Amino acid sequence: MHDIELSEEQVMIRDMARDFARGEIAPHAQAWEKAGWIDDGLVAKMGELGLLGMVVPEEWGGTYVDYVAYALAVEEISAGDGATGALMSIHNSVGCGPVLNYGTEEQKQTWLPDLASGQAIGCFCLTEPQAGSEAHNLRTRAELRDGQWVINGAKQFVSNGKRAKLAIVFAVTDPDLGKRGISAFLVPTDTAGFIVDRTEHKMGIRASDTCAVTLNNCTIAEANLLGERGKGLSIALSNLEGGRIGIAAQALGIARAAFEAALAYARDRVQFDKPIIEHQSIANMLADMHMQLNAARLLILHAARLRTAGKPCLSQASQAKLFASEMAEKVCSSAIQIHGGYGYLEDYPVEKYYRDARITQIYEGSSEIQRMVIARELKNYLV
Protein backbone atom coordinates (compact mmCIF):
# COMPACT_ATOMS: atom_id res chain seq x y z
CA MET A 1 0.00 0.00 0.00
CA HIS A 2 2.75 2.41 0.96
CA ASP A 3 4.41 2.10 -2.45
CA ILE A 4 1.21 2.40 -4.51
CA GLU A 5 1.74 4.54 -7.62
CA LEU A 6 4.95 6.11 -6.33
CA SER A 7 7.77 7.00 -8.70
CA GLU A 8 11.33 5.83 -8.12
CA GLU A 9 12.28 9.35 -7.04
CA GLN A 10 9.42 9.53 -4.56
CA VAL A 11 10.36 6.17 -3.06
CA MET A 12 14.02 7.23 -2.86
CA ILE A 13 13.15 10.47 -1.04
CA ARG A 14 10.78 8.67 1.32
CA ASP A 15 13.36 6.01 2.16
CA MET A 16 16.09 8.61 2.68
CA ALA A 17 13.86 10.52 5.10
CA ARG A 18 12.87 7.29 6.88
CA ASP A 19 16.46 6.17 7.37
CA PHE A 20 17.44 9.62 8.60
CA ALA A 21 14.50 9.78 11.01
CA ARG A 22 15.16 6.35 12.47
CA GLY A 23 18.91 6.84 12.77
CA GLU A 24 19.30 10.52 13.64
CA ILE A 25 15.98 11.75 15.05
CA ALA A 26 13.97 9.10 16.91
CA PRO A 27 16.79 8.09 19.31
CA HIS A 28 17.06 11.70 20.53
CA ALA A 29 13.42 12.82 20.49
CA GLN A 30 12.82 12.33 24.22
CA ALA A 31 15.97 14.26 25.14
CA TRP A 32 15.07 17.13 22.83
CA GLU A 33 11.59 17.27 24.31
CA LYS A 34 13.01 17.60 27.81
CA ALA A 35 15.41 20.31 26.62
CA GLY A 36 12.66 22.10 24.70
CA TRP A 37 14.96 22.44 21.71
CA ILE A 38 15.85 20.47 18.59
CA ASP A 39 19.60 20.02 18.33
CA ASP A 40 21.21 22.64 16.07
CA GLY A 41 23.43 19.99 14.52
CA LEU A 42 20.40 17.96 13.50
CA VAL A 43 18.84 20.99 11.81
CA ALA A 44 22.09 21.54 9.93
CA LYS A 45 22.03 17.91 8.74
CA MET A 46 18.45 18.35 7.57
CA GLY A 47 19.61 21.31 5.53
CA GLU A 48 22.45 19.30 4.01
CA LEU A 49 20.01 16.56 2.99
CA GLY A 50 17.74 19.09 1.31
CA LEU A 51 14.84 18.57 3.70
CA LEU A 52 14.54 22.29 4.42
CA GLY A 53 14.37 23.43 0.81
CA MET A 54 11.98 20.92 -0.69
CA VAL A 55 9.64 23.57 -2.12
CA VAL A 56 12.49 25.74 -3.45
CA PRO A 57 13.77 25.31 -7.05
CA GLU A 58 17.41 24.39 -7.58
CA GLU A 59 18.15 27.80 -9.11
CA TRP A 60 17.57 29.29 -5.66
CA GLY A 61 19.54 26.61 -3.83
CA GLY A 62 16.69 24.24 -3.10
CA THR A 63 16.03 20.58 -3.83
CA TYR A 64 12.60 21.10 -5.34
CA VAL A 65 10.47 17.96 -5.31
CA ASP A 66 6.80 17.37 -6.06
CA TYR A 67 4.29 17.58 -3.24
CA VAL A 68 3.87 13.81 -3.05
CA ALA A 69 7.56 13.38 -2.26
CA TYR A 70 7.38 16.32 0.14
CA ALA A 71 4.41 14.84 2.02
CA LEU A 72 6.10 11.45 2.24
CA ALA A 73 9.25 13.05 3.65
CA VAL A 74 7.29 15.05 6.24
CA GLU A 75 5.50 11.86 7.30
CA GLU A 76 8.79 10.04 7.84
CA ILE A 77 10.46 12.87 9.75
CA SER A 78 7.34 13.26 11.92
CA ALA A 79 7.34 9.55 12.67
CA GLY A 80 10.78 10.12 14.15
CA ASP A 81 9.65 13.16 16.12
CA GLY A 82 6.55 15.31 15.74
CA ALA A 83 8.38 18.47 16.78
CA THR A 84 11.04 17.99 14.11
CA GLY A 85 8.32 17.34 11.57
CA ALA A 86 6.69 20.60 12.62
CA LEU A 87 9.91 22.54 12.11
CA MET A 88 10.38 21.02 8.67
CA SER A 89 6.79 21.49 7.48
CA ILE A 90 6.34 25.03 8.79
CA HIS A 91 9.72 26.19 7.50
CA ASN A 92 9.07 24.82 4.01
CA SER A 93 5.47 25.94 3.64
CA VAL A 94 5.28 29.33 5.35
CA GLY A 95 8.98 30.14 5.73
CA CYS A 96 10.20 29.48 2.20
CA GLY A 97 6.88 29.53 0.35
CA PRO A 98 5.94 33.23 0.63
CA VAL A 99 9.43 34.39 -0.37
CA LEU A 100 9.47 32.05 -3.36
CA ASN A 101 5.98 32.93 -4.55
CA TYR A 102 5.86 36.67 -3.85
CA GLY A 103 9.41 37.88 -3.36
CA THR A 104 11.22 40.19 -5.76
CA GLU A 105 14.33 38.91 -7.50
CA GLU A 106 16.44 40.74 -4.93
CA GLN A 107 14.47 39.30 -2.02
CA LYS A 108 14.80 35.80 -3.44
CA GLN A 109 18.53 36.21 -3.95
CA THR A 110 18.92 37.53 -0.41
CA TRP A 111 16.92 34.88 1.41
CA LEU A 112 16.11 31.72 -0.54
CA PRO A 113 19.60 30.14 -0.65
CA ASP A 114 19.98 30.43 3.12
CA LEU A 115 16.40 29.31 3.77
CA ALA A 116 16.74 26.31 1.46
CA SER A 117 20.01 25.21 3.06
CA GLY A 118 18.73 25.65 6.60
CA GLN A 119 21.29 28.33 7.40
CA ALA A 120 18.28 30.55 8.02
CA ILE A 121 15.01 29.22 9.42
CA GLY A 122 11.79 31.08 8.71
CA CYS A 123 8.77 31.85 10.88
CA PHE A 124 5.28 33.15 10.12
CA CYS A 125 3.92 36.00 12.24
CA LEU A 126 0.20 36.14 11.49
CA THR A 127 -1.74 35.07 14.59
CA GLU A 128 -2.28 37.65 17.33
CA PRO A 129 -3.63 37.34 20.88
CA GLN A 130 -7.10 38.39 19.67
CA ALA A 131 -6.85 37.20 16.05
CA GLY A 132 -6.60 33.47 15.46
CA SER A 133 -8.98 31.91 12.95
CA GLU A 134 -10.25 35.45 12.27
CA ALA A 135 -6.93 36.29 10.66
CA HIS A 136 -8.04 39.57 9.13
CA ASN A 137 -8.75 41.13 12.53
CA LEU A 138 -5.15 42.26 13.06
CA ARG A 139 -4.04 45.05 15.37
CA THR A 140 -0.38 45.11 14.37
CA ARG A 141 0.28 48.29 12.39
CA ALA A 142 2.93 49.20 9.82
CA GLU A 143 3.45 52.86 8.92
CA LEU A 144 5.63 54.15 6.10
CA ARG A 145 7.84 56.92 7.47
CA ASP A 146 10.63 58.53 5.46
CA GLY A 147 11.13 55.49 3.25
CA GLN A 148 11.02 52.95 6.08
CA TRP A 149 8.30 50.73 7.50
CA VAL A 150 7.79 51.05 11.25
CA ILE A 151 5.91 48.08 12.70
CA ASN A 152 4.21 47.91 16.10
CA GLY A 153 2.15 45.09 17.53
CA ALA A 154 2.16 41.63 19.09
CA LYS A 155 2.14 38.15 17.57
CA GLN A 156 1.23 34.87 19.23
CA PHE A 157 1.99 31.17 18.60
CA VAL A 158 4.96 31.82 16.32
CA SER A 159 6.46 28.42 15.45
CA ASN A 160 10.26 28.50 15.00
CA GLY A 161 10.14 31.97 16.57
CA LYS A 162 13.27 31.62 18.68
CA ARG A 163 15.29 29.83 16.02
CA ALA A 164 14.22 31.89 13.00
CA LYS A 165 16.41 34.42 11.22
CA LEU A 166 13.59 35.63 8.98
CA ALA A 167 10.03 36.46 9.99
CA ILE A 168 7.14 36.88 7.58
CA VAL A 169 5.15 39.56 9.42
CA PHE A 170 1.60 40.59 8.60
CA ALA A 171 0.43 44.05 9.59
CA VAL A 172 -2.28 46.57 8.78
CA THR A 173 -1.01 49.31 6.46
CA ASP A 174 -4.36 50.82 5.47
CA PRO A 175 -6.87 50.53 8.35
CA ASP A 176 -9.79 51.92 6.35
CA LEU A 177 -9.57 49.15 3.75
CA GLY A 178 -10.34 46.22 6.07
CA LYS A 179 -9.08 42.90 4.65
CA ARG A 180 -7.51 44.77 1.73
CA GLY A 181 -5.47 46.88 4.10
CA ILE A 182 -3.16 44.09 5.34
CA SER A 183 0.37 43.78 3.97
CA ALA A 184 3.23 41.30 4.40
CA PHE A 185 6.83 42.12 5.29
CA LEU A 186 10.20 40.39 5.44
CA VAL A 187 11.68 41.13 8.85
CA PRO A 188 15.13 39.84 9.83
CA THR A 189 14.76 38.72 13.43
CA ASP A 190 17.89 40.60 14.49
CA THR A 191 16.16 43.88 13.61
CA ALA A 192 15.94 46.27 16.57
CA GLY A 193 12.44 46.15 17.98
CA PHE A 194 11.75 42.53 17.00
CA ILE A 195 11.46 40.97 20.44
CA VAL A 196 10.84 37.32 21.32
CA ASP A 197 8.99 37.77 24.61
CA ARG A 198 8.80 34.16 25.69
CA THR A 199 8.85 30.56 24.55
CA GLU A 200 5.56 28.86 25.37
CA HIS A 201 5.38 25.71 27.51
CA LYS A 202 3.18 23.37 25.51
CA MET A 203 1.32 20.11 25.89
CA GLY A 204 3.19 18.54 22.98
CA ILE A 205 5.82 19.09 20.27
CA ARG A 206 7.80 20.70 23.08
CA ALA A 207 11.10 20.68 21.22
CA SER A 208 9.54 22.97 18.59
CA ASP A 209 9.98 26.54 19.79
CA THR A 210 6.65 28.36 19.88
CA CYS A 211 6.94 31.99 20.85
CA ALA A 212 5.17 35.23 21.58
CA VAL A 213 6.68 38.15 19.69
CA THR A 214 6.44 41.91 20.18
CA LEU A 215 7.28 44.42 17.47
CA ASN A 216 8.20 47.71 19.11
CA ASN A 217 8.99 50.39 16.53
CA CYS A 218 10.56 47.62 14.46
CA THR A 219 11.97 49.51 11.48
CA ILE A 220 12.76 47.93 8.12
CA ALA A 221 13.48 49.21 4.63
CA GLU A 222 10.61 50.08 2.32
CA ALA A 223 11.92 47.36 -0.01
CA ASN A 224 11.09 44.72 2.63
CA LEU A 225 7.43 44.83 1.66
CA LEU A 226 6.58 41.32 0.42
CA GLY A 227 4.31 41.33 -2.60
CA GLU A 228 1.94 44.21 -3.19
CA ARG A 229 0.70 46.57 -0.52
CA GLY A 230 -2.70 45.40 0.69
CA LYS A 231 -2.22 41.83 -0.54
CA GLY A 232 -1.04 40.41 2.78
CA LEU A 233 -4.12 38.36 3.53
CA SER A 234 -4.03 36.84 0.05
CA ILE A 235 -0.38 35.92 0.60
CA ALA A 236 -1.22 34.29 3.93
CA LEU A 237 -4.17 32.33 2.55
CA SER A 238 -2.32 31.21 -0.59
CA ASN A 239 0.01 29.09 1.52
CA LEU A 240 -2.83 27.16 3.11
CA GLU A 241 -3.06 24.34 0.59
CA GLY A 242 0.59 23.34 0.85
CA GLY A 243 0.72 24.04 4.57
CA ARG A 244 -2.28 21.87 5.34
CA ILE A 245 -0.92 19.00 3.28
CA GLY A 246 2.27 19.26 5.34
CA ILE A 247 0.45 19.25 8.68
CA ALA A 248 -1.71 16.33 7.54
CA ALA A 249 1.49 14.44 6.75
CA GLN A 250 2.88 15.38 10.16
CA ALA A 251 -0.24 13.98 11.85
CA LEU A 252 0.04 10.80 9.79
CA GLY A 253 3.68 10.33 10.75
CA ILE A 254 2.98 10.73 14.46
CA ALA A 255 0.03 8.34 14.28
CA ARG A 256 2.01 5.77 12.32
CA ALA A 257 4.75 5.82 14.95
CA ALA A 258 2.11 5.21 17.63
CA PHE A 259 0.63 2.34 15.63
CA GLU A 260 4.02 0.72 15.09
CA ALA A 261 4.79 0.97 18.81
CA ALA A 262 1.41 -0.54 19.70
CA LEU A 263 1.83 -3.34 17.17
CA ALA A 264 5.26 -4.26 18.51
CA TYR A 265 3.99 -4.17 22.09
CA ALA A 266 0.94 -6.30 21.25
CA ARG A 267 3.15 -8.95 19.68
CA ASP A 268 5.42 -9.13 22.73
CA ARG A 269 3.03 -8.60 25.64
CA VAL A 270 1.60 -11.89 26.94
CA GLN A 271 -1.63 -12.04 28.92
CA PHE A 272 -3.77 -15.12 29.56
CA ASP A 273 -1.03 -17.32 28.06
CA LYS A 274 -0.85 -15.66 24.64
CA PRO A 275 0.32 -12.42 23.03
CA ILE A 276 -2.35 -9.79 23.39
CA ILE A 277 -2.48 -9.35 19.60
CA GLU A 278 -4.23 -12.73 19.56
CA HIS A 279 -7.06 -11.35 21.68
CA GLN A 280 -9.80 -10.21 19.33
CA SER A 281 -10.43 -6.87 21.03
CA ILE A 282 -6.78 -5.86 20.59
CA ALA A 283 -6.59 -7.26 17.07
CA ASN A 284 -9.67 -5.26 16.10
CA MET A 285 -8.16 -2.06 17.49
CA LEU A 286 -4.99 -2.60 15.49
CA ALA A 287 -7.00 -3.36 12.34
CA ASP A 288 -8.94 -0.11 12.72
CA MET A 289 -5.75 1.85 13.33
CA HIS A 290 -4.10 0.39 10.23
CA MET A 291 -7.16 1.15 8.10
CA GLN A 292 -7.36 4.75 9.31
CA LEU A 293 -3.68 5.33 8.59
CA ASN A 294 -4.08 4.08 5.04
CA ALA A 295 -7.20 6.17 4.48
CA ALA A 296 -5.42 9.29 5.69
CA ARG A 297 -2.45 8.61 3.43
CA LEU A 298 -4.70 8.29 0.38
CA LEU A 299 -6.35 11.64 1.13
CA ILE A 300 -2.96 13.29 1.60
CA LEU A 301 -1.48 11.84 -1.59
CA HIS A 302 -4.57 12.85 -3.57
CA ALA A 303 -4.30 16.46 -2.40
CA ALA A 304 -0.54 16.41 -2.98
CA ARG A 305 -0.95 15.18 -6.55
CA LEU A 306 -3.47 17.93 -7.29
CA ARG A 307 -1.13 20.52 -5.80
CA THR A 308 1.77 19.22 -7.89
CA ALA A 309 -0.36 19.42 -11.03
CA GLY A 310 -1.22 23.04 -10.29
CA LYS A 311 -4.90 22.24 -9.82
CA PRO A 312 -7.11 23.78 -7.11
CA CYS A 313 -7.07 21.60 -4.02
CA LEU A 314 -8.24 23.78 -1.15
CA SER A 315 -11.06 21.39 -0.22
CA GLN A 316 -8.91 18.29 -0.73
CA ALA A 317 -6.13 19.74 1.45
CA SER A 318 -8.68 20.57 4.14
CA GLN A 319 -10.13 17.06 3.94
CA ALA A 320 -6.67 15.55 4.28
CA LYS A 321 -5.76 17.71 7.26
CA LEU A 322 -9.10 17.26 9.00
CA PHE A 323 -9.17 13.49 8.61
CA ALA A 324 -5.48 12.93 9.36
CA SER A 325 -5.41 15.14 12.45
CA GLU A 326 -8.54 13.67 14.02
CA MET A 327 -7.41 10.17 13.04
CA ALA A 328 -4.05 10.80 14.74
CA GLU A 329 -5.64 11.56 18.09
CA LYS A 330 -7.75 8.39 17.90
CA VAL A 331 -4.86 6.17 16.83
CA CYS A 332 -2.55 7.54 19.51
CA SER A 333 -5.26 7.08 22.13
CA SER A 334 -5.71 3.47 21.02
CA ALA A 335 -1.95 2.96 21.21
CA ILE A 336 -2.00 4.06 24.84
CA GLN A 337 -4.94 1.76 25.55
CA ILE A 338 -3.13 -1.22 24.05
CA HIS A 339 -0.13 -0.48 26.28
CA GLY A 340 -2.38 -0.35 29.33
CA GLY A 341 -0.81 1.31 32.36
CA TYR A 342 2.57 1.38 30.68
CA GLY A 343 1.16 3.63 27.97
CA TYR A 344 0.61 6.30 30.61
CA LEU A 345 4.29 6.33 31.57
CA GLU A 346 6.97 8.53 30.04
CA ASP A 347 9.15 5.42 29.79
CA TYR A 348 7.12 4.48 26.73
CA PRO A 349 6.79 6.79 23.71
CA VAL A 350 3.06 6.52 23.10
CA GLU A 351 2.05 9.18 25.64
CA LYS A 352 4.33 11.62 23.79
CA TYR A 353 2.76 10.70 20.46
CA TYR A 354 -0.67 11.46 21.90
CA ARG A 355 0.43 14.87 23.17
CA ASP A 356 2.24 15.69 19.93
CA ALA A 357 -0.73 14.74 17.75
CA ARG A 358 -3.21 17.05 19.44
CA ILE A 359 -1.86 20.28 17.95
CA THR A 360 -2.51 19.11 14.40
CA GLN A 361 -6.23 19.73 14.94
CA ILE A 362 -5.50 23.35 15.84
CA TYR A 363 -2.72 25.00 13.84
CA GLU A 364 -2.76 25.72 10.10
CA GLY A 365 -6.52 26.03 10.53
CA SER A 366 -8.56 24.29 13.23
CA SER A 367 -10.83 21.33 12.52
CA GLU A 368 -13.78 23.70 12.66
CA ILE A 369 -12.25 25.89 9.96
CA GLN A 370 -11.53 22.84 7.80
CA ARG A 371 -15.17 21.82 7.97
CA MET A 372 -16.20 25.35 6.99
CA VAL A 373 -13.87 25.23 3.97
CA ILE A 374 -15.15 21.83 2.86
CA ALA A 375 -18.80 22.84 3.31
CA ARG A 376 -18.27 26.08 1.37
CA GLU A 377 -16.80 24.13 -1.55
CA LEU A 378 -19.87 21.87 -1.57
CA LYS A 379 -22.03 24.78 -2.74
CA ASN A 380 -20.53 24.31 -6.19
CA TYR A 381 -20.34 20.53 -6.02
CA LEU A 382 -21.92 18.78 -8.98
CA VAL A 383 -24.00 15.78 -7.97
Q: How would you label these PLM feature ranges?
A:
Residues 1-90, 102-107, 114, 118-119, ...:
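Alpha-helical interface subdomain recognition
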Residues 50, 74-78, 171, 187-192, ...:
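Short Ser/Thr-interspersed hydrophobic loop/turn segments at strand-loop and sheet-helix junctions
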Residues 65, 134-136, 160-165, 178-181, ...:
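Short glycine/proline-enriched turns and hinge-like loops at secondary-structure junctions
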Residues 88, 115, 130-133, 157-160, ...:
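Short Gly/Pro-enriched turn/cap motifs at secondary-structure boundaries
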Residues 118-126:
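A short, Trp-centered hydrophobic/proline-enriched beta-strand micro-motif
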Residues 137, 190-221:
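Flexible, small-/acidic-enriched active-site or ligand-binding loops
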Residues 148, 152-196:
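A short core secondary-structure module
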Residues 217-235:
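Long, acidic (Asp/Glu-rich), low-complexity accessory segments flanking structured domains
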